Structures are given as C-alpha cells and as structure tokens.
Amino acid sequence: MTHKILPISIIYINKEMLNQRIDNFMRSKFKSVPKSMIYRIIRTGKIRINKKRIKPHYKLKIGDILKIPPIKILCDIKNTFFPLNHSTNLLNRILYEDSHLLIINKPSGIAVHGGSGLNFGVIEYFRKLRPLNKFLELVHRIDRDTSGVLILAKKRTSLVSLHEQLREKKIKKEYIALVHGLWPDHIKKISEPLLKIQFKNKQKMVLIDKKGKPSETYFQIKKKFSSSTLLSIIPKTGRTHQIRVHALHAGHPIFFDKRYGKNDLDADIKNNHKINRLLLHSSGVHFIHPKNGNKIYIKAPLDIDFQNYLNTII
C-alpha cells in the first residue's frame, strides 16, 4: 500500500452539474476516496462552496465555486491492473452509441461497477477505455450474473432524463429466462412484495414479505421443453433480484441461479453441458431518447453459451 495526496481542487459549477447533491457529486468525482472520508470533510467544513460551509444535502447551482482541500488516500498498486481481455470484449459488445448514450450487451459474470472485492466493473472499464469522456455514468443496474442490455449516459442531462423515465415507468425492459419445470399457462403475472435483508456476513437476500416493496412481473411462455420452459419476462417494477425471486415463488427457479435456484438439478446439467451461468438475459429495452425525443428500441442477442444450451434441448 502507498499514499497519494490529491491536490486542492477548484471546480466551477456548470449546467451539467446543476442540482446534484454535493455528497453525490463528490462521490462520483472522487471515486478512489472512501465515502466515509467524503462525508467527514463535508461535515467538518473543509469543503467550501462560495467560501461557505455546506451540508451534505446541498444542491449545486450554476456559478457556484467549489473548493476541495488536499485529500490523502491509500493506493493499492496491485489493484490497478486492467484486464485487457475484458476491455476488448466489452468494446465488441456495443449495441448503440451517440453523443448522449452508450448501450452495451453486458456479458454474464461482469459486475456493472466495482466494489465488494471487485476492482473493476463495466463503468470502470469504459472510463479507462474512454478517458476523453468527461462524464460517463450508469443509468441503471443489472445483476452481475445477468447478461444483456445496459445503458450508460455520456451527459448528465441524459442521465437525469432517463432517471425521470425510470421513475415514471416509461422505460420498458424485456428479459428472457430458462426456468426449471413446465411453467403453468395461467401464471401470467406475479405481484408479491419484496424485502431485501442483509446477514451478518454481509450476504444479501431478497424475500417475499408483506413488509417489502410492491413488485410486479409479467411472464409469457415462449417455448416449453421436456423439463424446462423458456420465458419472456417484463418487470413493471425494478426491485433487486425481482425476476429471480418471483420465478422461485412460482416454483420454477431460473437455471444456474446460485442464490435462488435448484443446486442439485443445476449440478447435473453443469457436468453434462459445461455451462455455469445464470440463464437470465436482458433482451431489449424501450425508451425515449433524452435529446431528440425519438422512441428507441434496443435488442441484445443471446450470448453464445445461452444459445448453445438452448440448442441442445430443442
């Protein structure tokens, strides 16, 4: 481990930064600085706006002058390695790009962002690959083990617009999943509240519980096989692990779901077919383009391993 001192920073707030909370702005601007340190230097008044102390919830205004003191951080030299194979793979998986948006077909097994022992996620890879992009943020998240459509915003105005569409449920996401067993024809919608809990070992689980948040998922049968069903799925809400938990609730967990699946059945299939990934894929997304107002529909083809497994059971 070694120390690095970030120099004094003076930042002039423009319209791209407008209405951001100062704590969120600092966390996005200084990603290598621990969150606890950011809140400490705000609370102690070391961060000043227009020469005045501010609260963590202060929202930035155009013309504000932000002064940030020198910050001493720890750097782990071993963790700066940037895997070239992943970065090349991600560049080959771009589905759509313009001056406002970057949309990729995320592979299974790569997290959308670093943390919890991970040095790099999709957003860190693209920030390294696109150093001239001054702004690049995730519009939404999908699970590490889920593949498919992932939207990144290249401008803050685009991020704000798409977040508003998410809140107003104007963005429609489509998924494909292979589940165990024969899905009943009558189950077309599951509306069960979901509660997220965390254990002492920091492992997180989502349970169906009346104290949870309202959640709604629509299911349509695409094809039934001898002992499995391929489903088209549309989540109306965007809760953590929503599709996976609702599928389990119906008695038909998704193939190779290490947290909510049937490990005994999955183990036999892994040995026979050499596949070991969650068979859940974000196959498409509908939204309104944040700049020109056009209706956009982006489709993401199935990964080769997912498609190859389907070919073996047809």
Curated annotation (Swiss-Prot):
This is Ribosomal large subunit pseudouridine synthase C. PROSITE patterns: PSI_RLU, S4. Responsible for synthesis of pseudouridine from uracil at positions 955, 2504 and 2580 in 23S ribosomal RNA. The active site is at 143. InterPro entries: PsdUridine_synth_cat_dom_sf (IPR020103), PsdUridine_synth_RluA-like_CS (IPR006224), PsdUridine_synth_RluC/D (IPR006225), PsdUridine_synth_RsuA/RluA (IPR006145), RluA_PseudoU_synthase (IPR050188), S4_RNA-bd (IPR002942), S4_RNA-bd_sf (IPR036986). Keywords: Isomerase, RNA-binding, rRNA processing. NCBIfam families: PRK11025.1 (NF008249), rluA_subfam (TIGR00005). It comes from Buchnera aphidicola subsp. Acyrthosiphon pisum (strain APS). It is an enzyme of class 5 (isomerase). It catalyses: uridine(955/2504/2580) in 23S rRNA = pseudouridine(955/2504/2580) in 23S rRNA.
